[in-house]
Amino acid sequence: WRSIIKNNQDKKKLVITARVKRLIFTISILYLLPVIVIKNTWLFTTIEVVMSYLNPLVVLIAMFINMPVEKLVYLYYKTKAQNKLKSMNKLKIIGITGSYGKTSSKNILADILNIKYNALPTPRNLNTYNGLIMTVNNHMDKFTDIFIAEMGAYVKGEIKRLCKLVKPKYGILTRIGTAHLETFGSQENIQKGKFELIES
């Protein structure tokens, strides 16, 4: 019973992000439109019934409507992160990638560096493009001396894209294995993809 209670306590609370809130708002508007526009009761009821059966389609339409807004929001946060990195001239950036051992290597390195410096590792497994943007915007401040960026990839070119964003001066390559072989296509592609950090 103790383990069950502990597991329940460890469960994360549901977090509704700003993007989800915008999507819910657009979906609500789509469902309210018939109420505002259509005066015929029979036609209104018919449309509402049809829409209730086509919920997934309504969500897809809402997502399509929100696409321009989401692109602007994404561009805003990306530019904000890039400007912050450019403004921190003394910041040293270390990139870490590999098939296995990225997170543990990152955490060990952060513990060592934090003895003398103020090192910021990417939290948890935020090793994607959006994860790095989020880390820079939400966790980095003027007191950060070293940024340790964990970099994950599923296809060739992804590590190169991450390097263009944060521009690491140093790189650490951990073990390369067969993780994500189905998306990379071959062992050779995995090696090439991971070595993009060293080449950058």
Set out the residue ranges of the language-model regions.
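Phosphate-binding loop of NTP-binding sites
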Residues: 1-26, 30-200
